[in-house]
Amino acid sequence: MTFDRDEIRSCMLFNGVTDSETEDFLKRHPCKIRRFDKGDCVITREELSENIGVVLEGTLGIYSDSYYGGHAMVGIGGRDYLFGFIAMFYNHAHSITSLYSRGCRVAYFSVPTGQTPVDFISTTSPGIISNIFDALT
């Protein structure tokens, strides 16, 4: 699905960021938007490092492996919930195993294969990095 740049700019990732910084980020991390019906799998642990995901509308359930071998819901992410490659920046990165839609639209920003968190930080504008850390704290 193509995306509306104004809609993308309205998500918290780009709060207070200039148009040129936004465009630079979009060139480095191409965007696609997907709509998910309730119960659809949005992302699995194996896919976490491939994209940066931002919930634009609706909610998703956050699941982790349970002690008994199944999945347990550990939270709900609403508008502006960040996930995916971003997970490496916080403590629970390896505890999230999957995200399931409760009816949502998500923007995915591609992360180049092999890009490390250090590469990401060094090539991303300080405003976007600040917004990411604000969202995670």
State the predicted function of each range.
Residues 1-137:
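Cytosolic regulatory regions built on CNB/CRP/Popeye-like sensor folds
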